[in-house]
Amino acid sequence: MRFAASIAVALPVIHAASAQGFPPPVKGVTVVKSKFDENVKITYKENDICETTQGVRSFTGHVHLPPDNDDFGVYRNYSINTFFWFFEAREDPKNAPLSIWLNGGPGSSSMIGLFQENGPCWVNEDSKSTTNNSFSWNNKVNMLYIDQPNQVGFSYDVPTNITYSTINDTISVADFSNGVPAQNLSTLVGTGSSQNPWATANNTVNAARSIWHFAQVWFQEFPEHKPNNNKISIWTESYGGRYGPSFASYFQEQNEKIKNHTITEEGEMHILNLDTLGIINGCIDLMFQAESYAEFPYNNTYGIKAYTKEKRDAILHDIHRPDGCFDKVTKCREAAKEGDPHFYSNNATVNTICADANSACDKYLMDPFQETNLGYYDIAHPLQDPFPPPFYKGFLSQSSVLSDMGSPVNFSQYAQAVGKSFHGVGDYARPDVRGFTGDIAYLLESGVKVALVYGDRDYICNWFGGEQVSLGLNYTGTQDFHRAKYADVKVNSSYVGGVVRQHGNFSFTRVFEAGHEVPGYQPETALKIFERIMFNKDISTGEIDIAQKPDYGTTGTESTFHIKNDIPPSPEPTCYLLSADGTCTPEQLNAIKDGTAVVENYIIKSPAASKGNPPPTTTSSPTAAPTAGSAMLKAPVAMLAISALTVLAFFL
């Protein structure tokens, strides 16, 4: 990895006292200096911003790592200030296991998962208040949400003055030495990271190295977490299909080095006792999943015909033809194996080859879908998709919330610097040391539970591709997993939430009526799956102890494609100022730009948007829904949005 010789001196940061929009000065934080390194520290505050259950504690804070030599001997000339939000379990936190939650991107904040999916609260439509989530994942598990790599979400290198464009969702470094410009609907001011793409990890493996150093500090020195249960799990989503396998396998490798005394440095010898890796709608490996981008829009269980047969076949041709997607990815991986075997991304030739593969696959796979005007994260929704609701962005913009959190920077959902850094080296086309499917196999051989969970309406990391990954793994239990069949996921006495193939510690689950962010669509189903896996129960019923019956396998049907779904009603459009590029019509964007829009609690009331057209089908109505149980459970109202995809590896 190459780092800039220096980082520009940060502009003086103007605080809330002099300009609206900036975070207030940080006060009342607890500072814990590392007993291993005087330059390392943790700062944090206890608060009840989201978790309001009596007696249940939660903490927001940062782990601060100074500039230092990286693991491969190159000087890292920037600080890493990694944000965390820790929620104790609502039940028996001292004896509860702990799970890390990571969203993907690369560059997406884990506040997406916290507020739109599985955290203790939902943010209401007013963007100011919250509602308790009874299906929160911290009901029985201690949850640690982390913004990573550096500059993502509330994580930062150096606080820097910025402007934010609501029209195109972009952040720019600003010079306010001559005064702060007036804010309007299209331009806001605040404090963020440097936006320097050299001041963050530039690939998945380097992100794994960084998060391991964070974990060494947090698990040894954060004083508010002293559990009797030392098990650690990682649950992740989307680009987390790469983060999860790479991070977990790196943790496991480091554990082995600590045990055999290869690692002997004081402060870096804490065993991270891995229990589970969970991946929700993960984009894991292009070579397994690329074909699904052609097939899923053409032939899915909702009867949606987004592609013609001719279009599907043309995309498959572009995947397989000479110098097509697969050819370029193969060349990238061969070049990386030869020229960048340790995955530092410091070989310019390899970076160019892999970035070209990344861009080519994006062109062949993603560009055609843009023409459908359907949702990347929910094929049954329009492209301008208001679900899950983006109200948490306004909530996290409140001065009182930022003060209670002790954050010196404003929130940003997506870190442009991280995206540029990863895309510039072609990270999505690359493998890591074993390949990400090889990582999953390694973890299974090491006794770690692995769960793949996919909502069946997601396009961007769809369940067709996820199933191919599950069947393509090569480990000692491969044949047993293939012999297992699909069984119902029984959520309660009246509702079946999906189907699962499971053998022992490995499972693949298709969740009905869910898009990319499964817990946001099906909170009860997602919670049942999560808790059953975490507590060693079978996913189908929750009644069989997998630890006692390690050879357990599901029985049922070989395939699930015969289970068809109804297309849901189109969600009511909601143009949200802080997600304008993904939730607003061109007319509304123009009104925001010229200042004529009527806005209430970040929602554009005028001009109003019309409801989108239903997705195309071959029949007047699809076949019956998969269950006769109760209607699906949803989070209260309705999505975050990102810019139209311009690169393949731009996921949540």
Swiss-Prot record:
Give the membrane topology, semicolon-separated if more than one. Lipid-anchor; GPI-anchor
Query: Which residues carry a glycan?
Result: N77, N132, N161, N168, N184, N202, N260, N299, N347, N410, N474, N492, N505
- Reaction equations catalysed: Preferential release of a C-terminal arginine or lysine residue
The UniProt GO MF terms for this protein read: serine-type carboxypeptidase activity
- Where is the region Disordered? 608-627
Q: Which GO terms describe its cellular component?
A: fungal-type vacuole; plasma membrane; side of membrane
Which sites are catalytic? Answer: S238, D458, H516
Q: So what EC number does this one have?
A: 3.4.16.6
Query: What is the annotated localization of this protein?
Result: Cell membrane
Domain of life per record: Eukaryota
Fetch the Pfam families from UniProt.
Peptidase_S10
Query: Any signal peptide, and if so, which residues?
Result: 1-19
Q: Which PROSITE patterns match?
A: CARBOXYPEPT_SER_SER (PS00131)
Residue numbers covered by the propeptide annotation in the UniProt entry: 630-652
Q: Which residues form a coiled coil?
A: none
Q: How does activity depend on pH?
A: Optimum pH is 4.5.
* Enzyme class, broadest EC rank: hydrolase
Indicate where a lipid (GPI-anchor amidated glycine) is covalently linked: G629
Q: Tell me the GO BP annotations in alphabetical order.
A: proteolysis
- Entry keywords, A to Z: Carboxypeptidase, Cell membrane, Disulfide bond, Glycoprotein, GPI-anchor, Hydrolase, Lipoprotein, Membrane, Protease, Signal, Virulence
Low complexity compositional bias: what residue ranges? 618-627
Q: What does this protein do?
A: Extracellular serine carboxypeptidase that contributes to pathogenicity.
Family indicated by similarity? Belongs to the peptidase S10 family.
Record protein name field:
Carboxypeptidase S1 homolog A
Q: The organism's lineage?
A: Eukaryota, Fungi, Dikarya, Ascomycota, Pezizomycotina
